[in-house]
Amino acid sequence: MLTESMSNDTAFHPSTFILLGIPGMQDQHIWISIPFCSMYILALVGNGTILFIIITDKTLHEPMYLFLCLLSVTDLVLCSTTLPKMLAIFWLDAHTISFHGCLTQMFFVHAVFATESAILLAMAFDRYVAICRPLHYTSILNASVIGRIGAACVARGLLFVFPFIILIKRLPFCGRHVLAHTYCEHMGIAKLACTSIKPNTIYGLTVALSVTGMDVVLIAASYVLILRAVLSLPSQDAQLRAFSTCGAHVCVILVFYIPAFFSFFTHRFGRHVPPQAHIILANLYLLVPPVLNPLVYGINTKQIRTRILGLGLRRS
């Protein structure tokens, strides 16, 4: 009886999943791991440095830097949800992950991505208020408001992603447990099921368009309003500085969203997209923003750049 019960449970939910890595490129896994590992180290060092500087310097406890602090924490969690396991696959052939471990990774990947998307929207709003309503900046964005915004960003990510776990747990897998990927994501797991995954597809599409899609629209609207304000500045030098800063921000935002939407829509409509391209892009959208954000939002900011140079001179 016990054996039969275990057999039925395994047929419905496999006890483990096998993560293949990048199919067709297993021989190159070691070489592929080098740039990914290098970027991961850069992300850890860059975001860790930003956090250290902002936390230890009380003069930087202002709205813009507090948002940057939130972004750095999110970046550290985002890349750490997938990179350690991916490197374990590439270096140690550690392809196995438990069923619940896979669901946990899936939950954090999507929840942290949604949280970072909300934080990028909050940072765009911060820049809008700073440039378009500078006299009301400190009254609109005080520490209490920023704390509530941060909590709302996290709560929204958790709230919208939690149903993914329920939608996956209702699916039977009929013994299928091999994922052609380096990490667990919602549609990758759902496609292994031996029943209809229409509810998963519909809910995933709804979340992507209504949550992440709305973030993109509102971020774009914020930067359009910022652009209008910048064009009205009397000094050409001030205009160029504002264009340079906003242009860098927009580039990082595009790097964050374009590969993410490519990965999302490839699962649903990209039957002819090579799996290697899909998997590499699916990893890059979780790794490249954590590498770039400290450079664009942090080191590109004069106050933080000065603190970093001061740290370097003190050590030398």
Write out the residue ranges for each language-model feature.
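Transmembrane helical core of 7TM receptor-like proteins
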Residues: 1-316
